[in-house]
């Protein structure tokens, strides 16, 4: 079983709550980090592992009021990884 990944919200980064047990993947807030790699690399690593043992139902909630170009690149990478769920 995977550990839940929680990254607390800041004025420049969203709340990220990824839960393998429930299948809920939540992104909420603004995503304008100065270093998108620092924020999103752990997310990509978690999602890559998740698709190998995904919950039968996965609910992705992107409740982002704004995201910058760097964030959009990582979000697109994450979505591409999630398409591997069978």
What do these predicted ranges mean?
Residues 1-5, 53-54:
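Intrinsically disordered, low-complexity segments enriched in polar/charged residues with Gly/Pro
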Residues 3-44:
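STAS-typified acidic loop motif
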Residues 22, 55-59:
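A general structural motif
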Residues 38, 43, 59-86:
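Amphipathic alpha-helical interaction surfaces in cytosolic regulatory modules
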Residues 43-51:
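Helix-loop module immediately N-terminal to the HCX5R catalytic loop
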Residues 51-52, 83:
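Residue-level signal for alpha-helix termini/capping positions
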């Amino acid at each position: 079983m995977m550990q839940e990944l929680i990254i607390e919200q800041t004025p420049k980064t969203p709340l990220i709550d990824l839960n393998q047990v429930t299948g809920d993947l939540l992104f909420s807030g603004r995503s304008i980090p100065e270093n998108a790699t620092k924020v999103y690399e752990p997310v990509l690593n978690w999602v890559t592992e998740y698709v190998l043992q995904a919950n039968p139902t996965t609910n992705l909630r992107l409740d982002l009021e704004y995201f910058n170009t760097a964030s959009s690149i990582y979000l697109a990478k994450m979505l591409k990884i999630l398409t591997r769920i069978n």
